[in-house]
Amino acid sequence: KNLRRVEPLEKALKNAGIEVHYSPEMGVMERRGKSEDELIALRQAQSITEKVMSMACQLVCHAKARKDGSLEVEGDSLTSESLRARIDHWLLDEGFSNPGSIIACGPQGADCHEYGKGRLCTEAPIIIDIFPCSKSTHYNGDCTRTAVHGKIPVHIEKAYNTAVKAKFAAMKVTRAGVTGEAVHQETIRVIHEHGYETGLPGKESAASRCAMVHGTGHGVGLEVHEPPLLDFKGPTLIVGDVLTIEPGLYCPAWGGVRSEDMVAVRERDCESFNLLPDTLSW
């Protein structure tokens, strides 16, 4: 269960002139089916992640807006960098390392992989994605929420509510024996039902296009991203899989919204590790 990635070892052996052969699936199924001790560690990691998420979202929503729309806390500018530092310090005190939270405001959030930089602003969606690792157990948490300071624009609220509905629809079908693709298809169904698109934009796509551009989720354990994927061709889920379910919608014109929870697969359903509300205003 503690098998780490073998690529660094493979590289070192090859550099030493040793020929290496191994199956890329080595240890994958053993890693996927989490034991009760592993589930406890993951629940604890997610609990800490939720606490720091609550702190971050409340800090955003209770900040002061300057005349230019930028946010400040106690006279200091609130930026992606300063909020990221606060999150890092909070997690260090709790015994967690943090590779760098995503804090993407406004149009930056239209790129689901953008870490974010610069000032945070009022009346704009701010995607906050935190994925720390426990220094004692080495298991990861992973949670995303979206916060909006001040008045919430109608189009942002509609998009976020759709992402949340898609998340819970996906969770409802998540159980052992169902494929990761089937879970993703349920997410897509809800996204389309509410008038949004899915898939990467084309060369002629308008800036107003609002779509989900990534899979529904991924496995979590000793690494924050590990098998299985909840996406096209996603494999059959097994008892003990721990997954993120994280629908999002992204629009170049105004940014993005995303909500992410962590679940453990059971025989007939899944267990959610999350208690945080799904709200834009904290």
Placement of each model-derived feature along the sequence:
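Active-site neighborhoods and metal-handling regions in enzymes and metal-associated proteins
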Residues: 1-282
